[in-house]
Design a protein with these regions (language model features):
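Conserved acetyl-CoA pyrophosphate-binding loop and the N-cap/start of the following alpha-helix
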Residues: 2-7
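Contiguous surface segments at macromolecular interaction interfaces
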Residues: 9, 15-16, 20-21, 28-106, ...
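A cross-taxa feature marking solvent-exposed loop/turn segments within ectodomains of secreted
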Residues: 13, 149-151
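Short, flexible beta-strand-to-coil junctions
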Residues: 24, 145-149, 203
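Short gly/pro-enriched beta-turn/loop segments at secondary-structure junctions
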Residues: 81-83, 136-138, 151
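Short alpha-helix capping/helix-loop boundary micro-motifs
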Residues: 122-131
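Short coil-to-beta transition motif at edge beta-strands of beta-rich domains
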Residues: 131-145
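Short beta-strand-centered aromatic/proline hotspots
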Residues: 151-162
Length: 251
């Protein structure tokens, strides 16, 4: 969570890199964690303290795989034609738990109090019974909040997908602390083969795209009931309408 708030602060201040220092230990979980968000060790002090730096933007003279962009240079992501784009419907109750900071700025003090931890992290999990195939690492997820506001609200990037899971313990082991679903909800879901999507949340849209506009732009033909794959051209229309900052996209 502190990584999330640090990155958000860097974006607001227009800073290109952030750093932290840490006294490392053997099998240090924190080092593994920060490396998964693109922190790299650049120096160590005589007292055993290491210095780690995270750069928010990739070097222009290097080539990276789509998943590498999201991992090493989060919140940047790769959005060329090579990656698929999907609209993902989510009911309001789960949307509020999965994206607790939607349309609000989380305060540092909240991290010290009782809070929906899973919903306030970068790494998240989405469970569904959608039969849509082909989701892979690096693909883009466009979350559509159904029923109440009916609009595209947020963007994530796929890390891993598990298909046709029928054991609750398997799901628990896959999602770890990412899940906003209770054990009971998971047990009910696996009555049918369940898709588990692990993803990184990247941003909420400055200008959420309403359902009526999705119809007008022929992006949707009706209310989405399951995950829908869309064309790159439709994604570009969405990208312009919701005002995704090109500074954080690479293609």
């Amino acid at each position: 969570m502190f990584i999330k708030i640090g990155i958000q602060t860097a974006i607001q201040k227009n800073i290109d890199e952030i750093y932290l220092t840490h006294f490392t230990e053997e099998n240090d979980y924190l080092v593994t964690l920060i490396e998964d968000y693109g922190f790299e060790k650049i120096a160590d002090k005589k007292n055993g303290e290491y210095i780690f730096v995270k750069r928010l933007f990739p070097k222009k003279d290097k080539t990276y795989l789509p998943g590498e962009i999201s991992k090493k240079f989060y919140p940047c992501f790769y959005d060329s034609r090579e990656v698929s784009k999907f609209i993902v419907p989510i009911r309001p109750g789960y949307h509020s738990k999965l994206f607790t900071d939607y349309k609000r700025q989380t305060k540092l003090s909240e991290f010290m109090e009782e809070f929906i931890v899973e919903g306030n992290t970068i790494k998240k999990a989405y469970l569904c019974h959608s039969k849509t195939k082909g989701l892979k690492e690096g693909d883009i997820l466009l979350f559509y909040r159904s029923n109440d506001v009916r609009e595209l609200t947020s963007l994530g990037v796929v890390e891993k997908v598990y298909e046709n899971v029928t054991e609750p313990n398997q799901i628990v082991s896959y999602v770890g602390k990412r899940s906003v679903y209770s054990r009971k909800e998971i047990e009910e879901m696996v009555n049918k083969p369940t898709k588990v999507i692990l993803f990184k949340w990247h941003l909420h849209f400055e200008n959420p795209l309403k359902y009526k506009n999705l119809l007008n732009y022929q992006i949707l033909k009706g209310p989405p009931q399951a995950i829908i794959k869309i064309s790159h051209d439709k994604y570009l229309k969405i990208k312009g309408e919701v005002k995704i900052n090109d500074r954080y996209t690479f293609n």
